[in-house]
């Protein structure tokens, strides 16, 4: 296995895997989450930004994590950007827990998508689509 230490941005992982790296470790998803930076398929979202203070949408409506997706239980709706913004601004521990959960889910899903693209022989096409989406912005 080829190991790359301390690299953690989604784009860095995609490029490293594209170039043959097999293993990573990095604190970036959790550290960024604690500081209010969330990863989405359309780019990074800085939840502390005032524009999210009344935004009722989930972080990423296509994300299936427990933070973004209400799932089958309508009594447990997703956590809105406004609520996450509020938690981060008042330094409530739940804010860091929820944002960390989302970012880790994002990374696990990203790596799952890459594994599937490798198995299907479509990694190059998947990589282009990944960059196209990330450049849209949130």
Predicted features and spans:
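Alpha/beta catalytic cores of nucleotide-metabolism and tRNA/nucleoside-modifying enzymes
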Residues: 1-4, 9-138
